Amino acid sequence: MSKIIGIDLGTTNSCVAVMEGGEPVVITNSEGARTTPSVVSFQANGERLVGQVAKRQAITNPDKTIMSIKRHMGTDYKVNIDGKDYTPQEISAMILQKLKADAEAYLGEKVTEAVITVPAYFNDAERQATKDAGRIAGLDVKRIINEPTAASLAYGLDKMDSAHKILVYDLGGGTFDVSILDLGDGVFEVVSTNGDARLGGDDFDQRIIDYIAEDFKAQNGIDLRQDKMALQRLKEAAEKAKIELSSSTQTLINLPFITADATGPKHIDMTLTRAKFNELTHDLVERTINIMKEALKSGNVSLNDIDKVILVGGSTRIPAVQEAVKNFTGKEPSKGVNPDECVAMGAAIQAGVLTGDVKDVLLLDVTPLTLGIETLGGVATPLIERNTTIPARKSQIFSTAADNQTSVEIHVVQGERQMAADNKTLGRFTLSGIAPAPRGIPQIEVAFDIDANGIVKVSATDKATGKEANITITASTNLSDAEIDKAVKEAEQFAEEDKKRKEAIEVKNNAEQTVYQTEKTLNELGDKVSAEEKSEIEAKIEEVKKVKDGDDIEAIKKAMEDLTQAFYKVSEKLYQQNGGAQGQGFDPNNMGGANAGAGATNNNDDNVVDADFEVQDDK
């Protein structure tokens, strides 16, 4: 069986590894390095350069050199080179082809399969684009796994006998992720994850670029960012300065002949201190700390629960980042893994699991947002909560909202808000062929299935007839990082408002149910109720109808209470007439058996809830 390679397709650098002798081994590229710059360059003669050789000539060929293409994955962004448009998938495929060729040269055999890592907060479009890039490069992508999870595999492979709770802080060139995992007995279980797919080392570089450019503009009146060749030199100088400041307290930025004007050539000769760099990037570091707080909160994990902190990604070499993580967690970050290589090594381990070379290892990831359906009143009823371990299956019993309803529409939503309209619609489908019955009688089981690849399948089954309908949603995480962050933040900001709106809808639903049940029972009782009693109850019913659609919740509750009390008097009298025990009146809201109605099958089935379904006539 041919080897499956593990690839870390990074924003600034990429890495490839493979399992050998039960251990992950990083493959050295044709230039003798263990990582490859994620850079592609097109030459005037049509030649295409990838990696370090492409990066070296970027200054002299800025228009035809592409960097950080990962930030555009899953978008309609195009790169135009000599009149031809290239998609991010195509550019990424060129990088993957280079890694594939290096792996084949090392192994001495053809490589056709790979496990590729992505940021934990990559959405479905970005993940699919990564798979497409692999396919373009001639690779069958057997699995897409999250970068922090892959790093934990590399860290924990030799620690499977003891239980650990680890926090993985992954700050790469273009993305940031944090994941909290439980490690033990060969199981790597993600507890929670959070991140920002638009935050990374490139942003730190940009702060230095802007600082140099603004200083030069103030002195010379020229904005170097408008000159592509000068800008490329600034980028290289900024990256070099950032790296040097990780080991030195200051660095010299010397760029002779950066530009020229009527007075002659201009040069840059300035000193950048680590203190100034920290000042320029303080807010970026703070953003990562806030994301860590969110990950801990959503996973119900305290800092005292964390046994180890792992730093992943080249940008974690920045002293201010290390210091911030240490100060926040109270723990010295582990130096047991190479931040540039551990993700590729983890991908290789997962590849080994797939081929059977690695045994007794189970990787359990999570779904990033809550999945549910819309029910009566527009409420989002959750079936699978965010940070639920996948694969997973959850089901719940729902019922109809109208008499003789023969079909229902299932509206699948994703998000943290309590109202369906405030969440993301994933899909809709219809279950037809329901046997006609009073509302609340049919039992419809709605089930959610998520496999290890994050693909969602939702099914609805009529328990009486066995009729089934389903939908497969491949875009289960089809949200940008901004949309996910927004969904969670809005859920917190509007939690109280959502709670009040949900309570109001529940009260209105109860009012409607009370009216329906009372009218139905009153009609069934017929002449057993006197005209005077019937008139009093009907007056109370009209009062509930009059207020139930308004915004005065207390008025609705009062009208419902008055109606219930009026009906109690009648029911108590009827029980006494029929030999029943005094005081054992019945509640029109709580009747099972033959009188069961709106949204409930009987009192013993706690899984039955009101569902907002549309009535559709059978053709």
UniProtKB/Swiss-Prot annotation:
Upregulating conditions: By stress conditions e.g. heat shock.
Bias (Acidic residues): 607-619
GO molecular function: ATP binding; ATP-dependent protein folding chaperone; unfolded protein binding
Listed InterPro entries: ATPase_NBD, Chaperone_DnaK, Heat_shock_70_CS, HSP70_C_sf, HSP70_peptide-bd_sf, Hsp_70_fam
Keyword presence, Ligase: no
Renumbered residue ranges of the record's region Disordered: 578-619
Biased composition, class Low complexity, residue ranges: 589-606
Keyword Coiled coil found: no
Record key words, sorted: ATP-binding, Chaperone, Nucleotide-binding, Phosphoprotein, Stress response
Modified-residue entries (Phosphothreonine), positions: T175
General function of this protein: Acts as a chaperone.
Homology family: Belongs to the heat shock protein 70 family.
The protein's name in its UniProt record: Chaperone protein DnaK
Organism of derivation: Clostridium perfringens (strain 13 / Type A)
